[in-house]
Amino acid sequence: SSNGWNVIPFILGEWTTNSNWDGNFWANFPQRIREANIFIQNVHALNEQGITPTEVEYMKAECRFMKAYYYALLANTYGGIPFAPDEITPSNFNLSDLMIGQTPYDQVIDWCDKELQAASKILPAKYTEARKYGRATSIMCLAVRARMLLYAASPLVNGNTDYANYKNDKGENIISQTYDASKWRKAADACKELITEAEAAGYKLYEVKMSDGKIDPFMSYQDMMFKRFDEGNTEILFARPGGCNYSYYEALATPLRSSGNGGLGVTQSLVDAFSMENGLPITDPASNYKEEGFSDADEQRDNTDWASICNGGSITRKGTYNMYCHREPRFYICVNFNNGYFNQEDRVYNMFRGDGTETDNNGTHDAPQNGYFAKKKIYYKDNVKQGSYQYRPGILYRLGEAYLNYAEALNECDPGNEEILTYLNKIRERAGVRQYTTGNTDDNYIHVNLNNQSEMRNLIHAERRVELNCEGLRYDDLRRWKEAEKVLTGPFYGMNAYGRDAASFYKRTVYQTRVYKKAFYWFPIHQDEMDKNAKLKQAPYWN
């Protein structure tokens, strides 16, 4: 796939209405929707072949689910889309029949909402037969619905007057111009329904326990990405059963001298987002964060077996830059840093610039551009050199996200509700960081003001960033919060990839300057499509 290359002009602000994107939902999804419609019209029971009327009803509901899923993705990507959910183009069609305008965003979402609810009432909550894993379930319907309604309540599409002139061929506003607070309540109710139904069906956060029965936060967060549903990972609500293309993602996060393509990293901004071991952000003076200097001993912790099983015997090694020491467990599962342990070759990473035989940074695009490798979803036993990889399900929705979705929606529609902390704390407990409380007497907790909606919003957003990092959700979060222009524009930092020794390497250094234009909140309709259909209106600010 060349998707990684496609994104370069996008992040540099060079995207145009003639730019190509491999995903191309605009072309692909209508074809799939048409196939679903044809199937629904023609499927029938064949009892002698084991296709019972019940099975037929399941398959029809699965098609309804897929149609709603595709339409929700189209609306989230393009804003206004042509919408004819039940039409099948006849073979003797006139080209003019296909030229329809765009339907307002909220109308598409309302249709998807009804279809997902209807399908959820027909489909089972899960399948016990392994061969049926991956087929649509009621829980998948409710998961797609909950995230969709959360997005639909968010500032980008809920009364966004930036789009006052974004109208379809009938003169209707494509994005609503009036803020509707009830959308947050609808989203919260959808999230809670998902959680209630999922937990009743046996779904739960994935946990690995220590011998004393306590949660191992390192192993829990790591293995949640690798264990299959039938291995007890019932946190997975919706996944691609075929797994993933390991040779690409894993190779990009493996050094070139170890047979990888070593250019996939994370930003300094993400590194800074992880809290300290005590659960406080590094910006809090009470967090004990120390950025400069080096550790004088190996770091051990008694709440995990991860160090001995996966990381060569310690959390961090003596001589590690203090920036990376005493951080929360999720940090070590997600970020590979200089002097961090590389299990494939039983050594530590060397990110200093060099000729490539003794270093992981030879200065090419196959080297860390800012002193970091991505680590999340890279199994500690993966060996790119030998082509051996741990199975990794392609998780699209998981219960941990559902908890955070619910906390966010609840904070917007019912600030002060104690369930906001309940569900935030479920995530933090599994992550091994101190939980939040409205009391202020217990050092085992962090005091917060639950009634301060803005403070809680910041905490929820921060928790999403860390818990859901590298799962494909951050970009849509920044879009829907209308923060992308601020966050994705300007200098991006890391360590100094040109540094050949500690003194020159360990400096916050700009490795890239990015540009995010107001137009980029929506993907443009490709100019070829605009030229074909005079009824289409281009996404805002692209013309």
Regions from the PLM with identified roles:
Residues 2-78, 94-133, 138, 302-304, ...:
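Conserved, well-structured interaction surfaces
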Residues 29-32, 111-113, 150, 188, ...:
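Long, intrinsically disordered, low-complexity segments
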Residues 75-87, 157-159, 415-427:
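Short, well-structured active-site flanking segments
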Residues 28-38, 107, 111-118, 140, ...:
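Extracytoplasmic/secreted proteins, especially bacterial periplasmic and envelope-associated proteins
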Residues 348-349, 378-381, 400-406, 416-445:
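Active/binding-pocket-proximal capping segment
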Residues 1-2, 79-81, 85, 109, ...:
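An aromatic- and glycine-enriched ligand-binding surface/loop that stacks and positions planar moieties
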